[in-house]
Amino acid sequence: MKVVHVVRQFHPSIGGMEEVVLNVARQHQATSADTVEVVTLDRVFTDPSGRLSAHDTHQGLPIRRIGYRGSSRYPLAPSVLDAIRSADVVHLHGIDFFYDYLALTKPLHGKPMVVSTHGGFFHTAYASCMKQLWFQTLTRISALAYARVIATSENDGDLFAEVVAPSRLRVIENGVDVQKYAGQGATTPGRTMLYFGRWSVNKGLIETLALLQAALKRDPQWRLIIAGREYDLNESDLRKAIAERGLQDKVQLSMSPSQEQLRALMQQAQFFVCLSRHEGFGIAAVEAMSAGLIPILSDIPPFVRLASESGQGVIVNRDKIEAAADQVQALALHADNDFDTRRTASMAYVSRYDWKHVVGRYIDEYHDALGIPRVQEAVR
């Protein structure tokens, strides 16, 4: 069986969806005799002037890149039809042009397809009314072309239940590479928060600066590290926001750090902070907990569930910064006394998200889409 993953961004782009595709494909390839390929666009959205090679390999996975026109919000790439020609099963990632176009053209290509939701397209408030109309019409109709719609979180499951029949909707929460940063967080108590991920308005970075400002009134030892890559906020935007709040000596920016550099930053931090407005799942929070960082998270459903089930960290309201700062300071004071216990508990909880426990469910979906039983195979 050959499975072709179709995703708008992949290596060398870095992000949550890219990480999921990498791990599903890599684990599938490692545990079966099946063939796996990734089809993606030939430009990284944050550097659209640079065109990438049409064929590549990343961590043993073959990559085919295709051109596109239009914006990064809805890139038009009809040549995807040729790119999936050799597939037995197509696994779409995200609700975008590929999702709609491959559904529309299914009578032409005839490929069995499954799709992972990855939060849909509700990550920001941009064009929210139009998005709702699109979701209730085109997204609903396109879903009929897919053998299975795989919601990547309980939150997505509730959302897509509005437009997908229960018989074709399944929740498979994302796995996470919990070994990548395992145990890399600081081993002694302190007052350093770390954010890593996209530099996006959606991620609540401006609110995070406000939280730091309020926390410093309670304890002058607080620091913040913001690591990641530019998105709709760039380095200049963040430095301006930092300067406006007089936080130049309290905030460290690290743009596009390597994994080794991010590990080094984690070693300086005790807490992971993310005041995101929306997450389909929240991979970075799980990765941070695998490092032993204690989470400080916004009150959105995936984060509330993560904090509730793990019993770790605090959930704050990013619109009530003073109250949030009180919670964060109280958390730090408690952690001064039992930091090692909290650190160990965070790491232990997220072991359940290891990809080795998750990938078999995806392989089952591929076989169901083909209508053939799965034969268990020994790991190669």
From Swiss-Prot:
Transferase keyword on record: yes
Alphabetized Pfam families for the sequence: Glyco_transf_4, Glycos_transf_1
Catalytic activity: beta-D-Glc-(1->4)-alpha-D-Glc-di-trans,octa-cis-undecaprenyl diphosphate + GDP-alpha-D-mannose = alpha-D-Man-(1->3)-beta-D-Glc-(1->4)-alpha-D-Glc-1-di-trans,octa-cis-undecaprenyl diphosphate + GDP + H(+)
Domain of life: Bacteria
A molecular-function term among this protein's GO annotations: glycosyltransferase activity
GO biological process terms held by the UniProt record: polysaccharide biosynthetic process
Keywords per UniProt: Exopolysaccharide synthesis, Glycosyltransferase, Transferase
Documented EC number(s): 2.4.1.252
SUPFAM superfamilies: UDP-Glycosyltransferase/glycogen phosphorylase
InterPro entries with a match to the protein in the record: Glyco_trans_1, Glyco_trans_4-like_N, Glycosyltransferase_grp1
Chain's role: Involved in the biosynthesis of the exopolysaccharide xanthan, a polymer that is comprised of repeating pentasaccharide units with the structure of a beta-(1,4)-linked D-glucose backbone with trisaccharide side chains composed of mannose-beta-(1,4)-glucuronic acid-beta-(1,2)-mannose attached to alternate glucose residues in the backbone by alpha-(1,3) linkages.
Family note: Belongs to the glycosyltransferase group 1 family. Glycosyltransferase 4 subfamily.
Protein name: GDP-mannose:cellobiosyl-diphosphopolyprenol alpha-mannosyltransferase
Organism field: Xanthomonas oryzae pv. oryzae (strain PXO99A)
Gene: gumH
